[in-house]
Amino acid sequence: MEHFAQIRALVSQVKSPHVRALLDAFLDDPELQPAFLKAPAAMRIHHAYLGGLCEHTLSVLQLGWRICDHYPQLDRDLITAGCLLHDFGKVRELSPEPGGGYTDEGRLVGHIVTTCQLVREKAAGIEGFPRELEWRITHLIAAHHGRREYGSPKEPVTLEAMVVHALDDLDSQMSAFALLFQAAEAGAAWTDRKNQYGRALAVAQPAGTDDRRFGGQGLYRREMD
């Protein structure tokens, strides 16, 4: 619940009443909220453990806020919306049960389309929600995989969409590397080269530790079967 409380704290600072109402509609949904707290962010590769989706979402959100401090031309409310919602549909795409795999909705529709549908549904329930704002938020979700060959129905065409894609990819790669470090033998300087990258990776050794494999912000958890 600590991660969820931190997400709430960031969302509470959204200035646009329409964006705030939309994000609250997701976070307050009695079906979506418990699923969001429990869901993994993936079946393998990154944040592949119970609660991984909430952890990944918070990390991307925190990165988004730091980026907005550095680049004031970014719309912080849109960045917050994109970072929070980009993977929200995974609550319906992935089974939270160990070994559960993909749901039928996940296989037939996928989390990007599911999230876009949820945005349309939630926005329709908010009086006076601007249609163009809905389109821009939907674009953040539709474009967050970056390229069509990676599953994005649209490629980023706004600054905010480019940033959400980049931060999602960065946080996913950090978790993926961490899981490979964990799988390495104790004291090993390199991972096995049989991984999704097709190459051995130099194992990071966090300051103040004797074991290269461990350290970081909860990233070294066991992935789901």
Spans of features found by a protein language model:
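Extended, charge-rich intrinsically disordered regulatory tails
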Residues: M174-A178, A183, A188-D192, P206-D210
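Acidic-glycine-rich active-site phosphate/pyrophosphate-binding loop
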Residues: P30-L37, F88-L94
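Divalent metal-dependent catalytic cores for phosphoryl transfer on phosphate-bearing substrates
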Residues: E55, R66-A184
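Extended, charge-rich, solvent-exposed interface segments
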Residues: M1-F36
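Acidic, low-complexity intrinsically disordered tails
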Residues: L201-D225
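Active-site flanking loop/helix segments enriched in acidic
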Residues: P34-E55, G99-T103
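Short coil/turn segments at secondary-structure boundaries
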Residues: R20-F26, F36-A41, S95, S152-V157, ...
